[in-house]
């Protein structure tokens, strides 16, 4: 998936090389789950059941926080094999019945108090997840590179208030898992000075093919290495072996990311693809929270998103 991302432009040529990547993972309060006999959800159906169970135990809670509405929408289209965008015209394909149905389902979850998002909460939902007072959540879906932000602050006794667990995000079909691949890729531009091009290539080559660099960068940044060989690097192997939901939560996140490497997907890039992402993010936030008839609210949100995509591009 990392390699193919650089060849997605229709002519079979390689334009970018992967540097480091992240994805989304499900952070959960393992202590709470274990104490209450709750199973980590692997599907969205199970997620609904878990949210209901958590709400029954802690009525003041918001069981699930999801940081990126855009990622959520796009990932659902990928899991459902439903159209989102195309590199060829027509570009904007996301206004369809399948997508409207999953948005309607999540709207009902929001109305039941099961979830919030970064836009609706007004900040990263990790703030709810690590909260010790007031409203809190017990699950948070966010970037794998931000694992340390999903860890509560140590108490005066040197212990964490709860242990964090990390898992693959829920799926529509666990036999065909799909999780988003994000993070920087690099490309080299042609320049009039060939020495600049050579220097660029040597720099890119080092960043993308050196196992030592990839291992060190991953451990420092929280991003996942793009070379399979890094998994056998002695320093990186030792790092991952320490994985836990406390001091080594970044290692735990990395181990989950490595275990799901066959599930990664990317969306086609074209002039206007970033607009589509912004608009489906707005669409989902509006559809969850707007007052009114469900179908009318959702219909309006989809139509406005398509109109804005076409207007801007």
Model-derived segments and spans:
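Extracytoplasmic/periplasmic solute-binding protein
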Residues: 2-24, 48-92, 107
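C-terminal capping/gating helix-and-loop segments adjacent to ligand/active sites or protein-protein/ligand interfaces
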Residues: 16-18, 180, 245-305
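Short helices/loops that flank or line small-molecule/ion binding pockets
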Residues: 32-33, 52-56, 123-140, 282, ...
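Short glycine- and hydrophobic/aromatic-rich loop-to-beta-strand nucleating segment
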Residues: 24-28, 77, 186-188
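Glycine-centered hinge/linker elements that transmit conformational signals in sensory
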Residues: 51, 90-120, 169
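Hinge/lid segment of periplasmic solute-binding proteins
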Residues: 1-23, 39, 161-170, 238, ...
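Beta->alpha turn/N-cap motifs
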Residues: 69, 141-150, 184
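Extracytoplasmic/periplasmic substrate-recognition and gating elements
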Residues: 12, 35-36, 112-115, 155-226, ...
């Amino acid at each position: 998936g990392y390699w193919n991302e650089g060849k997605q432009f229709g002519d079979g040529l390689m334009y970018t090389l992967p540097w480091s990547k992240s994805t989304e993972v499900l952070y959960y309060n393992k202590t709470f789950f274990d104490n209450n006999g709750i199973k980590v959800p692997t599907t969205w159906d199970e997620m609904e059941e878990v949210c209901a169970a958590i709400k029954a135990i802690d009525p003041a809670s918001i069981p699930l926080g999801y940081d990126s509405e855009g990622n959520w929408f796009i990932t659902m289209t990928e899991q459902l094999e439903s159209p989102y965008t195309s590199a060829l015209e027509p570009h904007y394909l996301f206004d369809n019945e399948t997508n409207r149905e999953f948005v309607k389902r999540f709207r009902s979850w929001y109305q039941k108090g099961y979830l919030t998002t970064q836009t609706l909460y007004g900040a990263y939902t990790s703030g709810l997840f690590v909260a010790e007072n007031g409203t809190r959540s017990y699950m948070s879906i966010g970037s794998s590179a931000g694992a340390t932000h999903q860890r509560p602050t140590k108490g005066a006794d040197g212990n964490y208030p709860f242990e964090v667990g990390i898992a693959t995000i829920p799926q529509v079909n666990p036999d065909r898992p799909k999780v988003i691949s994000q993070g920087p890729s690099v490309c080299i531009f042609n320049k009039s000075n060939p020495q600049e091009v050579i220097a660029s290539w040597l720099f890119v080559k080092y960043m993308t093919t050196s196992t030592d660099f990839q291992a060190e960068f991953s451990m420092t940044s929280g991003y996942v290495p793009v070379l399979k060989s890094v998994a056998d690097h002695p320093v990186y192997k030792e790092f991952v072996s320490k994985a836990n939901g406390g001091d080594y939560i970044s290692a735990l996140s990395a181990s989950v990311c490595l275990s799901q490497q066959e599930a990664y997907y990317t969306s086609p890039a074209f002039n206007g693809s970033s607009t589509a992402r912004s608009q489906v993010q707005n669409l989902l936030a509006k559809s969850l929270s707007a007052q009114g008839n469900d179908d009318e609210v959702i219909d309006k949100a989809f139509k406005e998103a398509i109109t804005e995509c076409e207007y801007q591009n």
